């Protein structure tokens, strides 16, 4: 009897072990779930998202195969971004990809007491946003890529196009840390290029058109930041500037396509791809987000729109036809 009981116990133990082993294997081999929180609808952020998925795919993590994507766009509403991050935490996703600074900060706050890593992209100043330390290291289980503007290169380009200009206007959102720090950078170096920076702060997308109508009376041109609220309302800025006959300079290629005259900007698809490769390392257990410094693309590229320049009677340097990384002969409004 004792032998039969012992044999039964061994059998049950082995079965339990096998079941446990199967469960572990399923856990190890199951696909990943990533919650993507994108703050607003505009081309550069869309390109980041597409690049992010492409970067993951190049590392063997492909949507529809071993990756499930839960995508939410906050429509430039901070409260929606915060709710989205909390929902992702409740769903226990494997990772949150946060696109743009407001989404990144809300995701970081929501995951602070969890083990869910956050990978961000299109954050202009991770240090100012509280997502990284001064040396570039992470403040927690979060890392990503930075889209800091090449301010000096942008101002030099504006000077080349507008040799007699003195005042450059910037409209920015007062609640976006990335915009505040970039404005400060413009103000710090503007005199080196013979410019004065004129700023107007807004708190909501509905204020952008009014700010633009007032701004065009005071400046020779407007230069955009990667400000999510203002970029989402870009057509309002362009409408007022075109009526006044002054150029608007973009901060990336999608703004130039949409009607800005030119930009020394980043390629956001490539930025997103770089982010996707960082995310793959974390998902595969090859690195921890907390141990990874944020990364950036250091070299800007020249983008020009000859149709946008012609619309306001502005002649661009002839060399731009060959020097530009990409040029456009039509305006493709978003």
Locate predicted features.
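Short, low-complexity disordered leader/linker segments with a strong preference
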Residues: 1-33, 58, 62, 334
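Extracytoplasmic "Venus flytrap"
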Residues: 33-59, 70-79, 175-179, 228-232
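An alpha-beta-alpha
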Residues: 34, 52, 143-190, 293-309
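Beta-alpha junction/loop-to-helix N-cap segments that form part of ligand/metal-binding clefts
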Residues: 70, 74-133, 227-249
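Hydrophobic alpha-helical segments within soluble ligand-binding/sensing domains
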Residues: 125-167, 266-287
């Amino acid at each position: 009897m004792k032998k039969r009981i012992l044999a039964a116990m061994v059998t049950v133990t082995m079965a339990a072990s096998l079941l446990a082993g199967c469960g572990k294997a399923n856990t190890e081999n199951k696909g990943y779930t990533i919650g993507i929180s994108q703050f607003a609808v505009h081309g550069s952020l869309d390109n980041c998202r597409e690049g992010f998925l492409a970067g993951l795919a190049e590392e063997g993590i492909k949507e529809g195969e071993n990756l499930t994507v839960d995508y939410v766009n906050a429509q430039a509403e901070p409260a929606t971004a915060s709710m989205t991050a909390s929902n992702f935490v409740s769903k226990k996703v494997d990772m949150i990809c946060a696109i743009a600074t407001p989404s990144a900060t809300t995701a970081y706050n929501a995951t602070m007491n969890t083990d869910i890593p956050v990978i961000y992209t299109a954050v202009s100043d991770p240090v100012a946003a509280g997502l990284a330390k001064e040396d570039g290291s992470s403040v927690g289980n979060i890392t990503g890529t930075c889209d800091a503007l090449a301010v000096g290169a942008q101002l030099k380009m504006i000077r080349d196009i507008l040799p007699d200009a003195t005042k450059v206007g910037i409209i920015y959102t007062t609640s976006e840390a990335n915009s505040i720090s970039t404005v400060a950078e413009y103000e710090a170096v503007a005199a080196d290029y013979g410019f004065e920076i004129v700023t107007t702060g807004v708190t909501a997308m509905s204020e952008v058109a009014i700010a633009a109508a007032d701004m065009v009376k005071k400046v020779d041109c407007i230069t955009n930041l990667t400000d999510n609220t203002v970029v989402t309302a870009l057509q309002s800025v362009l409408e007022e500037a075109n009526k006044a006959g002054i150029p608007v300079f973009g901060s990336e290629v999608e703004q130039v396509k949409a009607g800005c005259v030119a930009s020394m900007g980043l390629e956001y698809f490539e930025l997103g791809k770089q982010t996707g490769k960082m995310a793959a390392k974390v998902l595969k257990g090859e690195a921890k987000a907390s141990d990874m410094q944020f990364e950036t693309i250091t070299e800007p590229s020249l983008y020009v729109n000859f149709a946008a320049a012609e619309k306001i009677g502005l002649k661009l340097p002839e060399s731009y036809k060959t020097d530009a990384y990409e040029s456009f002969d039509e305006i493709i409004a978003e």
